[in-house]
């Protein structure tokens, strides 16, 4: 109860300091008119669309990072723990090599084969060397996600798919044969299946 009068006095002083200058300015005609409600609604809708686009983009980038973590350390350590001691490094290196190999193949022509406009089985050369893959969304795939983000998200799955296969022939295949097989598998099997 003792604090109520000083608090009440403080509130009255704040109201006086804000209301009196506002009333004087309004009387003098200095207060600008509020923009029409349609302008305010249009501005709010634009801000909501930008926030939705940013949220979609962030969600896909975080998801892409998590899939990359499943491939790099996740599968590498898992497969490394399944093999004999002498083959641990070679088996782990397979997962990390596939990350680099599939990324290069995807950037050169894999994305174009999977998501370009072509025939029923394989895409065309629309996005060869990632041509035309920029920050603008592609309405064919996702209206609120930049094409680069979509490309990275799809790249992560193009990486983890052959990395999962390497567990089937851990300790059973030469390293050079693995690289050749995974290159052919990505080009002949994965990219056309992703296009269909």
Region locations from a protein language model:
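Hydrophobic alpha-helical transmembrane bundles of multi-pass membrane proteins
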Residues: 2-8, 17-196
């Amino acid at each position: 109860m003792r604090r109520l009068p000083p608090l009440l006095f403080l509130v009255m002083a704040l109201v006086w300091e804000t209301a009196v200058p506002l009333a004087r300015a309004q009387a003098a005609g200095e207060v600008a008119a509020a923009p029409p409600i349609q302008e305010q609604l249009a501005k709010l809708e634009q801000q909501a669309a930008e926030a939705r686009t940013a949220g979609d983009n962030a969600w896909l980038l975080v998801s892409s990072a998590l899939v990359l973590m499943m491939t790099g350390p996740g599968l590498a350590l898992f497969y490394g723990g399944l093999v004999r001691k002498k083959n641990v490094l070679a088996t782990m290196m397979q997962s990390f090599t596939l990350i680099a190999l599939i990324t290069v193949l995807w950037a050169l022509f894999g994305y174009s084969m999977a998501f370009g406009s072509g025939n029923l089985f394989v895409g065309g050369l629309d996005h060869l060397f990632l041509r035309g893959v920029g920050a603008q969304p592609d309405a064919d795939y996702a209206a609120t996600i930049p094409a680069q983000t979509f490309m990275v998200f799809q790249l992560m799955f193009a990486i983890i798919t052959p990395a999962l296969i390497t567990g089937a022939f851990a300790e059973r295949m030469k390293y050079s044969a693995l690289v050749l097989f995974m290159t052919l598998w990505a080009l002949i099997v994965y990219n056309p299946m992703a296009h269909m």
